Amino acid sequence: MDYLLSLIGSLLLVICVMVGVAFLTLLERKVLGYIQIRKGPNKVGFMGLLQPFSDAVKLFTKEQTYPLLSNYIFYYFSPIFSLFLSLLIWMSMPYLIKLYSFNLGVLFFLCITSLGVYTVMVAGWSSNSNYALLGGLRAVAQTISYEVSLALILLSFIFLIGNYNFLNFFMYQKYMWFIVFCFPLGLVWFASCLAETNRTPFDFAEGESELVSGFNVEYSSGGFALIFLAEYSSILFMSMLFSVIFLGSDIYSILFFFKLTIISFFFIWVRGTLPRFRYDKLMYLAWKSFLPMSLNYLFFFIGVKIFILSMLF
């Protein structure tokens, strides 16, 4: 019975994430519209509320094309696997009951984000297009570089908390949010999340000016829609994780969803305001700026933990 309830809970979560992704795309188009001093989509339904659903119908009813020289099986399955991974990562969502919230949630998150690299790489390689391959290689290098900083930031909090469970982040932030005394770390985390999810200003995998459309250049209709869904699902997850780790929000309060919306809005706001970074500067930022900073904070947290333990015993 418990297994059945957990299964139903996770299916409901996946459906809600999908609906959230639909409205996140609408929010993005609206916000970008107002940033560029124009209206966003406002024709379909009331104020364009049904626009994402008409987009979905359009994308999934289009003809599925594939390049003759592509490695068809890999080409076909990499978007599906990509979406599967970005939905699987939601299983580590810190709920107390009826979901798979487990003690090693942080480790699970790191494992799944590492696996996400392969889908992009395989999608780029199997298309058998130079543009797609270059985009895939860029995405892999970028994701691996920024994952180091993400892992170190998480590790520093784990040293402080002494547990891999996301639920413990709530308990430790009952009186003060981590963002208060780790503001620089919060900014590093946010920038790393932008790089992880291939968003502006780090969207080199999809650099239109250089690579046509990057690793998804050969994808159309359903395949493109699945890659798109995976990207926006991971944006929502990263926003959720930011509010859990730094803003200490209890997942059962309405404030948690408000914070999640604000962080998602920041993702869109950055896209509307910042130009694309230069690739060498991106790598410079990852290895010479973010890595030393997260290492310094790691040692700082180890020192704090040792100090607390020495005071106790």
Swiss-Prot record:
It is a multi-pass membrane protein. GO terms for biological process: aerobic respiration. Its EC number is 7.1.1.2. Keywords: Electron transport, Membrane, Mitochondrion, Mitochondrion inner membrane, NAD, Respiratory chain, Translocase, Transmembrane, Transmembrane helix, Transport, Ubiquinone. The chain crosses the membrane at residues 7-27, 73-93, 104-124, 150-170, 175-195, 226-246, 250-270, 293-313. Its main location: mitochondrion. It catalyses: a ubiquinone + NADH + 5 H(+)(in) = a ubiquinol + NAD(+) + 4 H(+)(out). The keyword Magnesium does not apply. It is found in: Mitochondrion inner membrane. GO terms for molecular function: NADH dehydrogenase (ubiquinone) activity. One of its GO terms (cellular component) is mitochondrial inner membrane. InterPro entries: NADH_UbQ_OxRdtase_su1/FPO, NADH_UbQ_OxRdtase_su1_CS. PANTHER family: NADH DEHYDROGENASE SUBUNIT 1 (PTHR11432), NADH-UBIQUINONE OXIDOREDUCTASE CHAIN 1 (PTHR11432:SF3). Belongs to the complex I subunit 1 family. Core subunit of the mitochondrial membrane respiratory chain NADH dehydrogenase (Complex I) that is believed to belong to the minimal assembly required for catalysis. Complex I functions in the transfer of electrons from NADH to the respiratory chain. The immediate electron acceptor for the enzyme is believed to be ubiquinone. This is NADH-ubiquinone oxidoreductase chain 1. It comes from Aedes aegypti. The lineage of its organism: Eukaryota, Metazoa, Ecdysozoa, Arthropoda, Hexapoda.
